[in-house]
Amino acid sequence: MEISRESARRLMIEKQGITQFPESNNKKSVVDTINHLGCLQIDTISVIERAHYLTLWSRLGSYDKNYLDESAYKDKKLFEYWAHAACFVSYDHYRFYLHAMKVREEEMKVRFVKRTGKDVEVLDQVLARIKNEGPLCSKDFEGPKKNGGWWNRKTEKVAMDYMYGAGILMVSDRVSFQRYYDLSENVLPSWVDVEPPSYDERIEFFIRKTLKSLGAIKPIDVRKYYHHHSVKLGQTTKQIEERLKGLDGVSRFKVEGDKNTHYSLDEDIERLDTLEGDFSFNDVRLLIYFDNMMWNRERVQHLFGFESKLEIYLPQDQRVYGYYHLPVLYGDQLVARIEPKMDRKEKKLIIRGYWTEPGFNETEEYTEKLERNLSTFAAFHKADEIEWLG
């Protein structure tokens, strides 16, 4: 059996929850979206807004950004940990990350000394302060220590990061995006399942979550969706393929233009057939490169014919597009790139650049939908107007 790239990308768009904005949103819709996606990447760049808020916007439309913060730090429905990268994850999945925490705890002391050149007693000192004083952030480690000398803020931050990775500390809150760490026993809700899964159960969990999130996948997609280093997957691509072959409820097929075998849940096979000729989504969405759908550049290139170019790390003279440009999804195609920037002082969304993909011809319908989507986007960021430059 072989399916078209068109069907594969259409299934992914549906699986990613992009095709329909809900009529209304609440904290449950935020948590449910993250639960379905498996994880939501956190990033510090805020040219428009931080990445996690934008990925949710592409699926929920207008929503209260406080819903995400409250769900994580007040209601304790979500926790921060390494999944694809630094992510929000549902507490329903917590136990599947215990293995990664254990591995990091075993490596922690050696890696800390190697990275900082400091004695491991710094870890104990930082932990003691948090035990005595409650949640602390890196800024709290400035000024003289009681026994003389000075706190090295960078070293203490590294210590907290390592203990966070080891599951000893958790992020209890963020203030102005600054992470506050507390003892895990003070953060972890009592209802959370902390029974470690078996080795096989853990691997199957990450495979099935990738299938549910992406639709038609290759084995490498599992290692790239849940980054193999982040979750300490411990599986080669070949080993994942052997597991996929043995899973109940999973079908095999080829995708046009790729010699590798693809896999999908049986429940999605009939939908793949339907999607060959029927795909009702014909709207516009602005995506970011930190969006779950855009993580795997090779996958995006194959299914959409779109070359991902995250240019924030490039010098200006090496950029083809803009510093923080966004891919534009129209129906089942990535058709353009746009570079918005938020002027918060003037309450203005500034469009610094816009580029259509080769072969795409703008229509009146597309232009209207793009403008409508930008208006919704601007309102979400509390911009009173949109200004196009150039």
Predicted regions: what they are:
Residues 1-390:
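Long, charged, low-complexity, helical-prone intrinsically disordered regions
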